[in-house]
Amino acid sequence: MEKTIYHGSDHIIEKPKFGYGKPYNDYGIGFYCTQNPNMAKEWGVGIDHNGYANRYEIECDGLTILDLNAPGYTMLHWLTILLENREFDTSAPLAAEAKEYLMNTFHLDYKSADIIIGYRAEDSYFSFASDFINGAISYRQLCNAMRLGKLGQQFVLKSKAAFEQLEFLGYETADSKEWYKKKAFRDQTARRQYLDVERNRRQRGDLYITTILDEEMKPDDPRLR
């Protein structure tokens, strides 16, 4: 099964290097792509520089794909991977306890996957996750918040085997004046919707991290689906 994917960057990348990148990205070191060319253009531009949506084709047959949106996983599986790779402020006792419990209970062997598909935690979305482990929002609110702004999914190449199946097809240029404005608007929209619609809209019966900890909830709990 072949898929077309895009990588947003400030330069053209004909041959991505395996093992190159920042270890503190959402899923650790990897080549971060999307199946949406417009999203790649937003990711590639900066306020003062143009960008590129590098286009590739990848043959997925024979590769192990961890799709965090599949029915067998919950938002807490995604959050646990994020906690392992990103720097969260867990100085508060609740956040520290939440991190420890999630790491012990919802940890996945994601490093053995060739490809990971899941949410991208840009600044706004990272703050949503932080609010959850600090008890400021419920699990329902977290799940809803991750869909604000329609950020979409990342398609991340993690293994050498995945890199070997990648073929460069070309690139599309992204003008900073056009695409940075769209990028900023998407982020601002997500923040505004979060504050207006989600953060202060508690519902009776909402599930908070304190309940998850107190009841020692497990991944198969139907309340997490």
Name each model feature, range by range.
Residues 1-26, 46, 54, 219-225:
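ADP-ribose/NAD+-binding catalytic cleft of ART/PARP-like enzymes
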Residues 10-11, 37, 60-62:
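Short, flexible loop/turn elements at secondary-structure junctions
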Residues 47-49, 60-225:
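Conserved NAD+-utilizing ADP-ribose enzyme module
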